[in-house]
């Protein structure tokens, strides 16, 4: 990996005599291979893909920057994101966070921090984001919409329907039900929803606890939307403790009828998993559709 050491020397703010002395592969990052780069004084987390042009990592860095600006939950500092100098592929270089076990206080801090993040409103009060980004490696359209119902239909459900069709994972009856749901969202999604800043891909693998017990958010797919959509995803695959939810509820209680919409919002993430991982997620998608449209 001498080429990576040379690339890192070009993009990192190294001191004149500072040399990268170690580059070790580590676990972390679902969209690329991950490494820790070390000098005698410092460490960085490096994630790269030889088959990407760097845009995925640029969008990740922009999402981290938005979360950092909000100041609600810590994020790693970004040192570089983009193409690899003089080589095909892309990479992102982040501050190395020494991880440790999550403490009770860590999960409570994450819950309070997410509540604070969700109080951050979009510029102009609209839903979406000023550019498209990615959820995993799937393109995620954004742009701006005046209502959450419009955004959820036009920028979330319908794009995934089209991607699923291309992958052969949208049989006729599933498509029919999904279109009926899109056409009747006003039955379940009320007016007056405020556009909260969302991490966008908050499963238990996209946050970590530092060795000091501080929660950090990683791998975002940010947009401004209904905070219930974010919280619904945290419940889809589990991994968040009751302390996390109690701290969130104390700081920013969810509406009493949130549970009516929870499966509706989990549907987007089930469609993402259907596209990425196959028909094993098809029955879960179908159960949600039957629940809402029969």
Q: Residue spans of the language-model regions?
A:
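Hydrophobic packing residues in well-ordered alpha-helices of helical domains and bundles
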Residues: 57, 107-110, 174-178, 285
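A cross-family signal for key residues in well-ordered alpha-helices
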Residues: 65, 235, 266
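ATP-binding pocket architecture of kinase catalytic cores
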Residues: 24-150
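An alpha-helical support segment within catalytic cores of ATP-dependent transferases
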Residues: 2-15, 85, 122-197, 210, ...
């Amino acid at each position: 990996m001498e080429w990576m050491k040379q690339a890192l020397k070009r993009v990192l703010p190294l001191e004149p005599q500072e040399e990268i002395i170690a580059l070790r592969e580590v676990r972390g990052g679902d969209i690329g291979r991950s490494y820790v780069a070390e000098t005698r004084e410092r460490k960085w987390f490096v994630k790269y893909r030889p088959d990407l042009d760097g845009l995925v990592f640029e969008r990740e860095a922009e999402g981290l920057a938005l979360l950092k600006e909000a100041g609600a939950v810590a994020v790693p500092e970004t040192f570089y994101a983009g193409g690899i100098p003089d080589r095909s592929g892309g990479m992102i270089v982040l501050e190395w966070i020494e991880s440790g076990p999550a403490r009770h206080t860590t999960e409570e801090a994450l819950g309070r921090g997410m509540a604070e993040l969700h109080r951050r409103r979009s510029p102009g009060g609209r839903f979406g984001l000023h550019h498209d980004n990615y959820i995993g490696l799937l393109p995620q359209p954004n742009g701006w919409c005046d209502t959450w119902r419009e955004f959820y239909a036009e920028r979330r459900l319908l794009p995934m329907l089209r991607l699923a069709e291309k992958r052969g994972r949208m049989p006729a009856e599933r498509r029919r039900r999904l279109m009926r749901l899109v056409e009747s969202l006003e039955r379940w999604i009320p007016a007056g929803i405020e556009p909260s800043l969302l991490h966008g891909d908050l499963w238990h693998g996209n946050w970590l606890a530092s060795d000091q017990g501080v929660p950090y958010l990683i791998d975002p797919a940010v947009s401004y939307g209904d905070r219930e959509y974010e919280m619904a995803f945290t419940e889809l695959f589990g991994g968040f403790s009751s302390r996390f939810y109690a701290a969130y509820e104390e700081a920013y209680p969810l509406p009493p009828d949130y549970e009516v919409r929870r499966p509706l919002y989990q549907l987007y993430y089930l469609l993402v998993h259907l596209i990425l991982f196959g028909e094993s997620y098809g029955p879960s998608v179908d159960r949600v559709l039957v629940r809402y449209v029969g």
